[in-house]
Amino acid sequence: MATSAIQQSAFAGQTALKSQNELVRKIGSFGGGRATMRRTVKSAPQSIWYGEDRPKYLGPFSEQTPSYLTGEFPGDYGWDTAGLSADPETFARNRELEVIHCRWAMLGALGCVFPEILSKNGVTFGEAVWFKAGSQIFSEGGLDYLGNPNLIHAQSILAIWAAQVVLMGFVEGYRVGGGPLGEGLDKIYPGGAFDPLGLADDPEAFAELKVKEIKNGRLAMFSMFGFFVQAIVTGKGPIENLYDHVADPVANNAWAFATNFVPGK
């Protein structure tokens, strides 16, 4: 809920602005020359992941790709059967949404498995399973970060929600507002204060990192979907499900659960 509120508030009022990515295609600059934009293909001309000869979604068996999918952006495998990328402004918005959701999913997937791993290795948690952890805030003792009351001690769901919306909404609004952008970058890859390690300094390496980010992010989104299904079907976290599968692969696998699953039981 809080994440949806952040995303909605961050994009509110942006419809009056032209998509920065579309401006990259048309004029190559944004904000009256304040920040010069950089085309992805030009930033890494030797990369195999961009341009006409990039890998396609079905390899050599791929049909003719749509004319608007030119391999300019990372993660473009030439697949758009629904025509979602046909309109440049819609494509620019969906591209931004995908990258942001990829980043949330990668953080979320890590947050789902890491507490369970620590718990299995002797670290004390009030509740290590990701979909059960939040309910600890309603317990008498509240929710302690990492099980330590000397760290963050939460007892109000409203306070947690407000803090998340205010703090994360501020950061996301700062990013969407475009300032200050790193040189040659845009609001999806703002650089500057958002790139303290200087990963965007080398254009070719940066172009490769964009591809790695989108590929890992898409896997993370599927992983999160799998974690949700596991929680509904087995009532266990991903690490515990993995342990069960390794212990008895025949009895604990997707097919066995799918054929025996009864909703509500």
From Swiss-Prot:
Gene Ontology terms: cellular component: chloroplast thylakoid membrane; photosystem I; photosystem II
Binding positions for chlorophyll a 5 per the UniProt entry: K212, Q230
Positions with a binding annotation for chlorophyll a 3: Q136, L146, E213
InterPro entries: Chloro_AB-bd_pln, Chloroa_b-bind
Amino-acid positions noted as binding chlorophyll b 1 in the UniProt annotation, renumbered to this chain: Y57
Binding-site list for chlorophyll b 2: R103, I152, L181
GO-annotated molecular function: chlorophyll binding; metal ion binding
Post-translation changes: Photoregulated by reversible phosphorylation of its threonine residues.
Residues engaged in binding chlorophyll a 2: H101
Binding-site residues, chlorophyll b 5: Q164, F261
Binding-site residues for chlorophyll b 3, renumbered to this chain: S156, E172
Bilayer topology annotation: Multi-pass membrane protein
GO BP annotation list: photosynthesis, light harvesting
Function: The light-harvesting complex (LHC) functions as a light receptor, it captures and delivers excitation energy to photosystems with which it is closely associated.
Family: Belongs to the light-harvesting chlorophyll a/b-binding (LHC) protein family.
Protein name from the UniProt record: Chlorophyll a-b binding protein 37, chloroplastic
Organism the protein comes from: Petunia sp. (Petunia)
